[in-house]
Regions:
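Active-site-proximal segment of RNA-dependent polymerases
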Residues: 39-100
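Polymerase palm active-site segment centered on the conserved acidic dipeptide of motif C
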Residues: 196-200, 206-280
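A structured, charge-rich N-terminal accessory region that forms the first stable segment of a protein
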Residues: 1, 7-8
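Glycine/proline-rich, flexible active-site/cofactor-binding loop segments
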Residues: 22-53, 146-156
Length: 322
């Protein structure tokens, strides 16, 4: 780093299959140290400019925080569910794979020059540029069958989405810089007079009493995203009266109550079935840990009856033998 000869090492690349096929890169241990070096210096500065309505990869926030914020936004905007208001949910198409590396590197560099006061500012600027512009697909070891990549769209893989585009899903800096990039969008929505809004990665909602105001926001958002090299996923546009509810970060939020989406319940049931089939203590312990995790998640939703129903699927011999 001191001699400006640092180059990221070989990454591990694989494809996860659930809930959908997705390409992931894992950086080498040495590179992760560099990622944390960057994060430790920039995260406190990013927190000072981030909107309070950005929920992912931030201390004290997360999926549950976002769901609770959405629930409260609906309650406030509808005046305790007594007045009409509307929910609009938008999504970005191929967000991580669409990020323009050069544009992101320039934005981060300008930010560092303006806000960072440390003596190692030159090192930080250098490392950020190297890390952002790095193409891990050119030096990686694949740990999944090649047939898995055939199931990915061309714009879902760094190998095929085009030169100079995309950041590796799985790296710490990708999450941090993605938030930084979309911070522009968060404040734009706020400045357009939408008080009730929130974002988790590339999934964001807006709530307002005037549905025409919400619809008028869409082309403005589309225009802003185009300047960042991004675009909306037109197939995931959602617009409804608040009484219809909305799905957000794996939960379904309705007036005064929250439910878990079907996929989570299906996975919960699968964990119960693994427990029933377990034939040794290790497998039982693994299944029980998974079940406890789902119970911890479901306790934050209005799912008491569902929890009882699923737990009743545990076969009696499990209690007797273990």
């Amino acid at each position: 780093i001191n001699t400006r000869q640092y180059a990221p090492g070989k990454s591990i690349c694989f494809v996860v299959t659930r809930p959908r096929y997705r390409e992931v890169f894992a950086a080498s241990f040495e590179d992760r140290i560099v990622h944390h070096y960057i994060a430790l210096r920039l995260t406190p500065l990013f927190e000072e400019i981030f909107s309070e309505r950005t929920f992912n990869c931030r201390k004290g926030k997360g999926q549950l925080y976002g769901v609770n914020m959405l629930k409260e936004d609906i309650r406030q905007c509808s005046n305790n569910y007594t007045e009409d208001c509307y929910i609009m949910k938008l999504d970005l198409k191929g967000f991580f794979m669409s990020i323009d590396k050069k544009l992101l590197a320039e934005m981060v560099d300008r930010f560092i020059v303006k806000y960072y006061k440390g003596e190692d500012i030159d090192d930080l600027r250098y490392l950020c540029r190297v890390v952002i512009l790095h193409s891990p697909e050119k030096n990686c070891e694949r740990h999944s069958p090649l047939s898995y990549w055939e199931k990915l769209d061309k714009n879902k893989s760094l190998f095929t989405n085009g030169e100079g585009k995309g950041v590796a899903i799985g790296n710490l800096f990708a999450q941090i810089f993605a938030n930084f990039l979309l911070n522009t969008l968060d404040w734009f929505i706020e400045n357009e007079g939408i008080e009730h809004h929130g974002r988790y990665v590339d999934d964001f909602y807006c709530i307002h009493k005037d549905k025409e105001k919400l619809l008028a926001l869409v082309p403005k958002v589309r225009e802003l995203l185009a300047k960042l090299g991004l675009r909306l996923n037109e197939k995931k546009f959602y617009f409804q009266h608040y009484s219809k509810g909305v799905e957000f970060t794996g939960s379904i939020v309705k007036p005064g109550r929250v439910y878990t989406c079907n996929r989570t319940i299906t996975n919960f049931i699968a964990a119960i079935r693994r427990l029933n089939k377990a034939n040794n203590e290790r497998k039982v312990l693994h299944a029980v840990c998974s079940i406890n995790s789902y119970l911890g998640l479901l306790r934050h939703t209005n799912e008491y009856a569902m929890r009882r129903k699923v737990l009743n699927m545990i076969e009696p011999h499990i209690y007797k033998e273990y």
